[in-house]
Amino acid sequence: MYVIDPIADMLTRIRNANNARHEIVDIPASKMKKAIAQILLEEGFIKDYEIIDDGKNGIIRIRLKYGPNKERAITGLKRISKPGRRVYAGKDELPRVLGGLGIAIISTSKGIMTDKKARKEGVGGEVLCYVW
């Protein structure tokens, strides 16, 4: 299946599985999606993820994280830069999500990273999405 915006598709799959309280969600893999999954893991939004070889690009299997009473670790996901309207931010205008409680995932010349790391590295880039 061909998808126009693979990152929006990934975020939608995670959002839907999260709202339905599923434990795992499978997403078609790509380098960028693997980098986003790694950031979600490092920031504590997911339990873990694994790459499953299917003979093509592979599949990312994400294990979602919930609290003791099934409270969601991910409250919201929002795609910012879209194929029809790219959104870029310089190093001095990187967004803060919910006053620092959430993260912005930025695609920079030094790779995909959070807004906090991009500020520390002193780089700007394309604002892919917000997670809170």
Swiss-Prot record:
The keyword rRNA-binding applies. Keywords: Ribonucleoprotein, Ribosomal protein, RNA-binding, rRNA-binding. The keyword Ribonucleoprotein applies. It comes from the Bacteria. One of its GO terms (molecular function) is rRNA binding. One of its GO terms (biological process) is translation. GO terms for cellular component: ribonucleoprotein complex; ribosome. Belongs to the universal ribosomal protein uS8 family. Part of the 30S ribosomal subunit. Contacts proteins S5 and S12. One of the primary rRNA binding proteins, it binds directly to 16S rRNA central domain where it helps coordinate assembly of the platform of the 30S subunit. PANTHER family: 40S RIBOSOMAL PROTEIN S15A. This is Small ribosomal subunit protein uS8. It comes from Caldicellulosiruptor bescii (strain ATCC BAA-1888 / DSM 6725 / KCTC 15123 / Z-1320). The gene is rpsH.
